[in-house]
């Protein structure tokens, strides 16, 4: 057992994201499985569509963080560029982060 997160494969690490106001949190496994959603009580006064959009935006960021880390692992192992071209990139992650930052 190690305390070094880099020693754990990206697919097995946990990634989390939250809204700027910290009212919605989502935790995702690097493989993409959602591990948890946390909603702070004040967010429950918002319309359901806003809450759903916040959950989706958080899940997207957490998922993409894991996928970008996984892609980096593949690149380090010498995977050919065309073999991982379908995987999300840092640019995809930044677009998701920008969308999340735009939420209230």
Show where each model-derived region lies.
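Short, acidic, Ser/Thr-enriched surface-loop or helix-capping motifs
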Residues: 29
């Amino acid at each position: 057992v190690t305390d070094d997160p880099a020693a754990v494969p990206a697919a097995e690490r946990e990634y989390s994201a939250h809204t700027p106001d910290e009212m919605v949190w989502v935790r995702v496994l690097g493989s993409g499985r959602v591990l948890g959603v946390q909603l702070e009580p004040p967010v429950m006064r918002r319309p359901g569509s806003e809450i759903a959009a916040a959950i989706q935006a958080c899940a997207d960021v957490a998922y993409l963080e894991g996928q970008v880390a996984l892609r980096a692992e593949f690149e380090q192992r010498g995977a050919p560029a065309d073999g991982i071209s379908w995987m999300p990139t840092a640019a995809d992650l930044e677009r998701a982060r920008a969308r999340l930052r735009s939420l209230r």
